[in-house]
Each structure stands twice: as structure tokens, then as C-alpha cells.
Amino acid sequence: MAEKNKKEHPVTKDRLHPRNKHRERYDFDALIATTPELAQYVTLNIYNDQSIDFFNPAAVLCLNQALLKHYYGIDEWNIPEGYLCPPIPGRADYIHNIAALLGTSANDVIPVGPAIKCLDIGVGANCVYPIIGNNEYGWSFVGADVDPVSVASAKNIVDKNKVLQGNVEIRLQNHPLDIFYGIIGEGERFDVTICNPPFHASAEDAAAGTLRKLSNLQHKKVTKANLNFGGQHNELWCEGGESAFVREMILESKKFAASCLWFSTLISKQTNLQKAYDQLEVLAPFDVRTIPMGQGNKSSRLIAWTFQSKEAQAKWVSARWK
């Protein structure tokens, strides 16, 4: 009888990048072998598949710990209560797409090694983008955040994992309205900047969005969110929402045009894409790219832009990517 209820799943998650380690379904046996604590959260669902309760913050946290240890060599990873526990496959996809983007500046040869420097705007308490980027490509990272608790948490993750020490630096942004100012030092160079910007425009919007997410997971209306699930205010919302945040980033990027080869950001809301294009058109970068991304039923995209001409890109690569 169980076989009749067995749901057919695709062998791979085709919407994820070909280099993404998470294209196949989670191998819970392998993950439990790496992190035995995960076993208590793994059950068989109605389709007779191993899974966890994604509504349970402790289960999601333990799954992330197992994924980061099994695939990325991170022995110690935790986040403060109430902070965002990100989906690892989607975060990995951003990194792999950025690697391909950097390759376009070097005859499609993806750059690897610590000479490649990436700036993560809004690194968060979880420090996941630097973890993945350093493991997959050997890049060095600077992670910036406006929240002192997030900064302390990210620093703690770096300090507790030797593979990150010397490769990841965490900086506090002391001026919450600034993006690059106060973070990029004089004469400092970054090969790429990445960002997963706050989505919502207010605390109320963020709370409503969290309830919608939980309702979708539970397939029923949820009226109260678990504090562990949604994330802190600076992770989820800012004045003006995603559109305003990206607008400020684009404006500041012009001032740092010579400091960064490529700028990039995720755009979750389709309607914000044209606003970003319009803003970029005013500043006239040399090149603008849009890269579609998706996981499951969720679609998003990242946009990237550079003020460097092809000749300038070639000089940049020749001087730095050795």
C-alpha cells in the first residue's frame, strides 16, 4: 500500500545551478552519519520519504548544521534565537551563479583562490555565503552587517572553524543607512559584491509575510509565528523595502565604481526589477546582467552590473587573478 502512496520525485532539482551540491534530494542517512543529532527530527512522511518538519525551527537548524558539516566542512555552526536560518541550496545557487559571472570577465575561466575577494552585504548571523564561497572556490570574504548581534555571531562562526580563519573577515556597518560607505576602505578592491536585501518595507509587512510562509508550509492558516522562524527586523525589512535598499546600493556603487569589478544583488520582487534597471540606466554602467534563479516553486533573480569596460576588466583580471 505504501508504494501506491509513494510520490514520484525528480532525480534532480533542475532549477538549481549544475554545480550546486544540493540538486538531489537530501540524503538523510549520510547527513545523520555526519550529524547524529539530526536523527531525532527525521521521520517518514505520507509519501514514505524521509523528511523533517520544516515548521520546527530546531529541526531546520539541525538540518543546516548537518548540511554545512557534510558538504562544507563546518564543524561548529549556530545562530542566536530568533535569527534567520537560511535554506542552504538557494544560498549555494547565488554563489555558483556569481562564479560563472566572474568567469565572463576571464574568457569563461572561473577564478578560484584567496586572491578573489567578495564583499557580502548583510552577512547575517549565519555567515552562510562566505562559508559556501570559501569552500567551493577558495575565495576570501568580507561580511558586513548593521546588527551587532549578527556580527558577533558571524565572528563566532569564523573563530570556531579553522577553515574560515584568515579567509573570512566580519565588519560592523556603523551607519545603517549606508551600504558601501564605511565598509570599503580607501584603496581596497573587491572582485564582486553580493547581497540578499531586506524584502519588506515595515515590521507589519514582515510579520504578515512570515505568517503566509508558515501557512503555506502547514497548508492551513497560521495566526502566530514562532519567533525562531522568521528572522530579525534588519534581516527582513527596512524603510522602503527591497526597492529602496537596492536603489541606495546602486547609487553608492557609482561612487565605488573603481573599487569593485562586479556589483550584484538578489531581487525577489519582480516589480522591483524594472525600478533597478531604470536607476542603472541613469548611472550608465558598462554592462548589466540579469540571471534567473529558482528553487522549488519560488522564482527570483539576481542582477549584476559593472562600470569597467572590457579592456578595464582584462587589466583587472591580469593584475589581481593570479
Swiss-Prot record:
Organism this protein belongs to: Cytophaga hutchinsonii (strain ATCC 33406 / DSM 1761 / CIP 103989 / NBRC 15051 / NCIMB 9469 / D465)
HAMAP family, sorted: 23SrRNA_methyltr_F (MF_01848)
UniProt protein name: Ribosomal RNA large subunit methyltransferase F
Gene Ontology molecular function: 23S rRNA (adenine(1618)-N(6))-methyltransferase activity
GO CC terms of this entry: cytoplasm
GO BP: any one term: rRNA base methylation
Catalysed transformations (reactions): adenosine(1618) in 23S rRNA + S-adenosyl-L-methionine = N(6)-methyladenosine(1618) in 23S rRNA + S-adenosyl-L-homocysteine + H(+)
Zinc listed as a keyword: no
Gene3D superfamilies: Vaccinia Virus protein VP39
Keywords: Cytoplasm, Methyltransferase, rRNA processing, S-adenosyl-L-methionine, Transferase
InterPro entries in alphabetical order: METTL16/RlmF, rRNA_lsu_MeTfrase_F, SAM-dependent_MTases_sf
Top-level taxon: Bacteria
Gene designation: rlmF
